[in-house]
Every structure is written in structure tokens, then in C-alpha cells.
Amino acid sequence: MDRDLELTVRDLAEHFKIKGQIISCEPYGGGHINSTFLLACLDENGKQRRYVLQRINQSVFKSPEQVMANIKAVTDYLKPFAEEPRNVLTLIKNQDGKTFYINEKGEYWRIYRFIEDSICLDLPETTEDFYQSAYAFGKFQRDLSNFPADTLYETIPDFHNTPKRYETFLKAVEEDVCGRAASVAEEIKFFKDRKDFYSVLIDNCNKGTLPLRVSHNDTKINNSMLDFKTRKAICVIDLDTIMPGFSVTDFGDAIRFGASTAAEDEKDLSKVWLDMDMFKTYAEGFLDGCGGQLLDSEIMLLPEGAKMMTVECGMRFLTDYLQGDTYFKIHHEGHNLERCHTQMKLVADMEAHWDEMKAIVKKHCKNQQ
């Protein structure tokens, strides 16, 4: 690590109530949003303690203090449910008692206690890994089932407001700033044909059949930590996007990413479909983790959550393609269109297996009528 950067990191860490002297610091993890460093400290008894120092990316999170207020509220609430300290992220306070430090550049920094003896997977190595990740996110819902979700800040407004995303998509089609709309008429029709579906979750929320809950909003497997030895779920991490939302969208985003048989930008669409065994595994893990806290009406909307997150993501890729690839990072011409195609194929496969998806989740309802 660059010597000047190391000195900067060490100086930042001194503003927090970490235990011991810093003996090493190095860049850590593969996250793209925040700059992250792993610190190793040696306390007065010769015990090594490790911490994770992060800079919050203010181009993504416009109100870092709201992000940190959400994280503090949720982690404080979760602590009584933890069987051991590793079961919940632990924020280290700065010397003034706050959960973040602002340096002279106006950057926001925070420190978490490192979760020892754990592994973080980008992809499940076994179906049990996928089950355990699902269980972790389900237990997150169970433990927060009585948390007043409406007290959290909406740090990214309309993040999963699919009707709003559709409005943005229609505007992109109409404006056609890059002259690409004519070449993607079939793709545009695909999303227009499903317009009546986009309000399903909000409509159910308004009816009271889909309660507002704390949603994580980034339920990829690498945001759940597993024990290194037992491979059992330890906890959920990366809480930057926690907001008021729906349990079914957390479930759905995990399915979109984890139960697909191919990468998000796979060009050969014959390789893309919904792995029903993985869907079943995740549903079982998630609902076992929820421990009966979800309403039957919520459980029956889990397939809608999976389809909604997938169709919304595909729509966002196409919107970005129409607008000139200004939001998602692309690696070659047409990359966003390729991503859009995989999501379209996944949606179509979900529709083809709809009755099966519904039957799988119905088995977990309290009322089997």
C-alpha cells in the first residue's frame, strides 16, 4: 500500500475508539462503492483485534449521516437478539461518541469490528451455502419484525418504486437521445406489455396485505457472512441501503441474482433460466429464518417479489442503454442491452414456472386453504 495512503489511514483510525496499537493496515474486499481497509491492532495484553475502516461514497449516498443513523438504529435494535457478538455488525464510535468521523476533506469515515472466523462468498459453492445466506436474510426480517420501519430514512428515494422506474423508462423511450429506440422495439414492447404488473406490490401495501418492513436492498450472497468452520449463517452485512421497504423485494433480488443459471451479462440466452431447485432452497432458507413472522399474504407474494426485481432490473438496463449508458458501468458497446436480455429471459422463465413457484411458497403458509 502507498506509504502516504497508509499514513492517512492510520491517522483516520486514531479518531476512533479502537483498542490497541495499529500494527498493519491494507486495502480490503471487493466492494465497488466504499473505500475499505482492514486494520490489525495489538492491545496491551498482546491480543490482536481487527477492524474494518470504510469511507462512505458520497456520490452514491448523498446523506451519509442519514445512512449512519439508519445503521445505528438497526444494529442497536438487533443486539439483544445476538447469541454472540458476531451476529450483528458492531460500529466503533469516534472520540466524540459519534459513529462516523468527517475529515478535513469532508469525507465520512466509519469503523466496524471485523467478523472473525468467517467467510464471504460471491457465489454459493453448495446449495447449503445458498440456504444459509437465505436463512441470514430471513432471520434479519424476523429480528426486525417489530422495528418501526417508517422511522428509517429513505436514503435513496424510490429505490424499488417500479412504477416510477417505468415512468423513467417511458421518458427515455420518448426522448430517444441516442437514436437507439428503433433498434430495440421488441425489448420496449416486452416491458410495456407488463405495465399492469408494476404496481402489484404497492397496491398490496395499500391494502394491508404487504406490510412495510425494514428492507436490506442488497441481498446478494456476499452480504451474508458464514462461519468458516461450520458454514452456518453468522450475520448480514453491508447495511448502507437499509430503508423502509418490503420483505418480498429482499427475497426477490436474491433470487434474481442467485437462482439464475448464468451471469448477468451472458450473451448465450440458451444458458439463462431460473433454477427451480435454487428457488426452492432459497425460499426454504428465507422462510425458516423468518420464523413465522411473515403474513401468509406476504409469503404468497414472494414470487411477485422475484419477478418484480428482475423485470425492474431489466428495465433499468434498457433505460440506461437508451440514455447512452450513463449509469451502469459498461465494458463494451451494447453491454447494458446484453444485461437487459438476460433479465428478460429470466422473467419469461419465471412466468413459465409461475404455478410451481406459487406452490413452493404456499407450503410455508400457516393457512393451507
Please place each PLM-identified region on the residue numbering:
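Hydrophobic alpha-helical bundle architecture
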Residues: 113, 285-306
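Long, compositionally biased intrinsically disordered regions
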Residues: 350-354
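Catalytic activation segment of kinase domains across protein kinase-like and atypical kinase folds
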Residues: 222-263
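Conserved ATP-binding subdomain of kinase catalytic cores across diverse folds
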Residues: 25-28, 32-42, 48-167, 247, ...
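Protein kinase-like catalytic core scaffold
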Residues: 51, 87, 110, 213, ...
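Active-site activation/catalytic loop segments of kinase-like enzymes and analogous catalytic loops
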Residues: 248-292, 308-327
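ATP-dependent phospho-/nucleotidyl transfer catalytic cores
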Residues: 26, 30, 55, 61-65, ...
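Juxta-kinase regulatory segment immediately upstream of eukaryotic protein kinase catalytic domains
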Residues: 1-26
